[in-house]
């Protein structure tokens, strides 16, 4: 953790994230955009991420599925096979050419999965689910994951992390946030309803998350790992603070590089203090932040970095706009999850600076 030394624009001060020297504290987080046909990154992703890359700026990719059975819908990217690895390479190169630091978020979408092969984890029954692209998908009805299948899940994350490094990413972020996603389903006692060695206590419910982190750390190194949590969002655990604090302590022991925590938007700057005290690495705060409260969080050492999702989506040069206090583009919500490679994706205007 580093204290801020520039009271003028705290978000634009440098920060050392492990071996990475960041020039500002503004993070572009993982945002699902639904533009990777057949779960493979397309060429327009290169322009999209390159537009938002800055020298010494941290970017986290949209969630990439760890395996074929973990994907949420057909137009989200994956990182489980060689074709996907090769497709990610020009995207990563585009960010690196701008001097950016690029982490790949990896996930298993849990009960939201639309697997091509579903025999491992689902019953024969079919359920229906409407996803962000407004299409309705037939899904196998989810059943509790049998504990003897868990090593397969852990190994999927390990291989996906290895593939991400092979594609050129600087590190990976494990998605353990809420929304029906697998890791959070295990951690949250309001969702996880079966009894085995992964249930009962907080320690048991965090076991899967920590087994995944440890396996990935053994594969690529803990100094290349971040993890995203949202303990106060969605269907909350009965003791969210205790759960998050336990995870923060355990992740510190494993030497994880950063912890990325989503806050409930109505209580920004109030819920991360116990986590801040428990976690010894870099803390990234997220959750409806604007420029002023983001600066306050950095200035008061509440968090080390702040991620801005929709604001960064609509303003590809957001760090520059913050630096010069320029007006911001408004985002167009209707284009968030379309398949269009340009509209609402790469056509947001940059700040025009007079020569």
Curated annotation (Swiss-Prot):
Record-linked Pfam families: Oxidored_FMN (PF00724)
Coiled-coil residue spans: none
Signal peptide interval: none
InterPro entries, alphabetized: Aldolase_TIM (IPR013785), OxRdtase_FMN_N (IPR001155), Oye-like (IPR045247)
Alphabetical list of SUPFAM superfamilies matching this protein: FMN-linked oxidoreductases
EC number annotated for this UniProt entry: 1.3.1.-
Superkingdom of this protein's organism: Eukaryota
GO-annotated molecular function: FMN binding; oxidoreductase activity
First-level EC class: oxidoreductase
Induction: Seems to not be influenced by wounding.
Record family assignment: Belongs to the NADH:flavin oxidoreductase/NADH oxidase family.
Function statement: May be involved in the biosynthesis or metabolism of oxylipin signaling molecules.
Name of the protein this chain belongs to: 12-oxophytodienoate reductase-like protein
Provenance organism: Solanum lycopersicum
Lineage of the organism: Eukaryota, Viridiplantae, Streptophyta, Embryophyta, Tracheophyta
